[in-house]
Amino acid sequence: MKVETYLFGAVDVSPEKVITFPNGLVGFEQSKRYMLVHEEGPAEPSSFTLQSLDDPMLAFQIVDPVMLGFNYELALSDAENALLQSPSPEDVAVMQVLFRKEQDDKGSITPNLRAPLVINTKSRVGLQKVMETMRPNITLSNLSSSI
């Protein structure tokens, strides 16, 4: 299928590359189909673009929390497990959406720690896990030794 995007122009997307978020993402519930795009190169990509296939103007920068030194331990409800088609742990990718605070003139980018994306990499189905209270077990591993 050919998709027009504002970041990448016209892109051919094979159906097996589509990631479906049945409930959409918070604030963007109408967009349910996405593709992941990353810069080509010899190194592992540090971030990805999650491009909506339903809205060509909608794209998010996402990152593996491990790249930022975070390790999530998330408990999924029975409904979330069913939506993700009961994946085994090795088939799950947890990603964080990056955002820029509007009141920040420095243009700093922050990960959304309260609402990570959880994706079943085999079935290519995902959800946004919104945590009402911030109580995940997070391990920081990239701390500078000069602290």
Curated annotation (Swiss-Prot):
GO cellular component terms, A-Z: cytoplasm
Q: Does the keyword Cytoplasm apply?
A: yes
Is tRNA processing included in the keywords of this UniProt record?
no
Q: Give the UniProt subcellular location, in the record's own words.
A: Cytoplasm
Concerning Pfam families, the annotation shows: FliW (PF02623)
Task: Give the InterPro entries listed for this entry.
Answer: Flagellar_assembly_factor_FliW, Flagellar_assmbl_FliW_dom_sf
Single GO biological process annotation from the record = regulation of translation
Swiss-Prot/TrEMBL keywords? Bacterial flagellum biogenesis, Chaperone, Cytoplasm, Translation regulation
Q: What does this protein do?
A: Acts as an anti-CsrA protein, binds CsrA and prevents it from repressing translation of its target genes, one of which is flagellin. Binds to flagellin and participates in the assembly of the flagellum.
Its assembly, as annotated, is: Interacts with translational regulator CsrA and flagellin(s).
Q: Which HAMAP family match?
A: FliW
Give the UniProt family note.
Belongs to the FliW family.
Q: What is this protein called?
A: Flagellar assembly factor FliW
Q: State the organism of origin.
A: Dechloromonas aromatica (strain RCB)
Give the organism's phylogenetic lineage: Bacteria, Pseudomonadati, Pseudomonadota, Betaproteobacteria, Rhodocyclales
